[in-house]
From Swiss-Prot:
Domain of life: Eukaryota
Modified residues (Phosphotyrosine): 38
Species of origin: Homo sapiens (Human)
Disulfide bonds: none
The protein's name: Large ribosomal subunit protein uL14
UniProt cross-references to PANTHER family, sorted A to Z: 50S/60S RIBOSOMAL PROTEIN L14/L23 (PTHR11761), LARGE RIBOSOMAL SUBUNIT PROTEIN UL14 (PTHR11761:SF8)
Length: 140
């Protein structure tokens, strides 16, 4: 798989259950000052008639800030999903899910805007985005 599509990422992206359609509101798990993120599109999704684009762990999305610092609101930011409530299957056969849906604000290259992440980061996301993995407190 080409690395060009996911700027700044490394490793192979495996198929996981997509639990966050366009319109989902997720927690912002970094220290940028944003409280939540509203997903408006998913990067790399071509789509099909009447099907909402959906994101899963490790996907880059375009999002707006609904609650948070005024300088972050009313703008479109790229973000990466780091946790999802919808269970997904790992290659070793274990099913995994988190207690919340969360993401972090990044730039187009995949470098974090903030400098800290609250809560665990999914291993699938950490493998794809090295800059997020370096700021993660714990990787689950």
């Amino acid at each position: 798989m080409s690395k060009r599509g996911r700027g700044g990422s490394s490793g192979a992206k495996f198929r996981i259950s997509l639990g966050l359609p366009v319109g989902a509101v997720i927690n912002c798990a970094d220290n940028t000052g944003a409280k939540n993120l509203y997903i408006i599109s998913v990067k790399g999704i071509k789509g099909r008639l009447n099907r909402l684009p959906a994101a899963g762990v490790g996907d880059m999305v375009m999002a707006t800030v609904k609650k948070g610092k005024p300088e972050l609101r009313k703008k479109v930011h790229p973000a990466v999903v780091i946790r999802q409530r919808k269970s997904y299957r790992r290659k070793d056969g274990v099913f995994l899910y988190f207690e919340d849906n969360a993401g972090v604000i990044v730039n187009n290259k995949g470098e974090m805007k903030g400098s800290a992440i609250t809560g665990p980061v999914a291993k699938e996301c950490a493998d794809l985005w090295p800059r997020i993995a370096s700021n993660a407190g714990s990787i689950a």
